[in-house]
UniProtKB/Swiss-Prot annotation:
Alphabetical list of InterPro entries matching this protein: Acyl_CoA_acyltransferase, Leu/Phe-tRNA_Trfase, Leu/Phe-tRNA_Trfase_C
Compartments where found: Cytoplasm
Catalytic reactions of this protein: N-terminal L-lysyl-[protein] + L-leucyl-tRNA(Leu) = N-terminal L-leucyl-L-lysyl-[protein] + tRNA(Leu) + H(+); N-terminal L-arginyl-[protein] + L-leucyl-tRNA(Leu) = N-terminal L-leucyl-L-arginyl-[protein] + tRNA(Leu) + H(+); L-phenylalanyl-tRNA(Phe) + an N-terminal L-alpha-aminoacyl-[protein] = an N-terminal L-phenylalanyl-L-alpha-aminoacyl-[protein] + tRNA(Phe)
Domain of life of the native organism: Bacteria
Classification via Pfam families: Leu_Phe_trans (PF03588)
GO molecular function: leucyl-tRNA--protein transferase activity
GO cellular component: a single term: cytoplasm
UniProt name for this protein: Leucyl/phenylalanyl-tRNA--protein transferase
SUPFAM superfamilies referenced in this protein's UniProt entry, alphabetically: Acyl-CoA N-acyltransferases (Nat) (SSF55729)
Residues spanning the membrane: none
Protein family per UniProt: Belongs to the L/F-transferase family.
Amino acid sequence: MSLPPEILLHGYSIGIFPMAEHRNDPDVFWVDPIRRGVFPLNGFHLSRSLARRMRRGGYQVSIDRDFAGVLDGCADRAETWINPEIRASYLALHHLGHAHSLEVWQAGQLIGGVYGVVLGAAFFGESMFSRRTDASKIALAHLVDRLRQTGFALFDTQFLTAHLASLGAVEIPRAEYRRQLERALNGAADFAAVIEQSPQGVIQRITQTS
């Protein structure tokens, strides 16, 4: 059974998020980490190799063009916490305008992406995937730039992985996370705003702020 949108949003508003043990487990549980992963929006680490890859182009980035495709891409791995109940819950949130995706395309194929939940000026990153080298890094670079440009104050990554840490994410105590969350919830942001996001523009803005 999927979680009703109002229950999901309330959970995020108090600093917890749902997970499942694996795709075939119908049970969903709430998680409240002692230490929380966050992505400082002015601290993205853009490596020279990633900047070169972005300058070469050959890819396109879109917003909310294929939310279900991103969700399924994130679930398409040997071990995943995205079970049918969670999938249905986030699709419902997306239809209500509270969950968004950023897609990376190449030659008409979805090669990477990230999705998350929005409340106020907080973006709760849920999962990402990559079907080509650097596709998830490109997605994150464009996502961080979009969050900065559209008024966000908090990018919650839930947990800190080595991959995220290499790109600039950090870990903070639960109490500090909740302080940042409260401030962000009182703010306003527009994830889907029309903005400039050319690869060169993203590189320039990230380089100026990191």
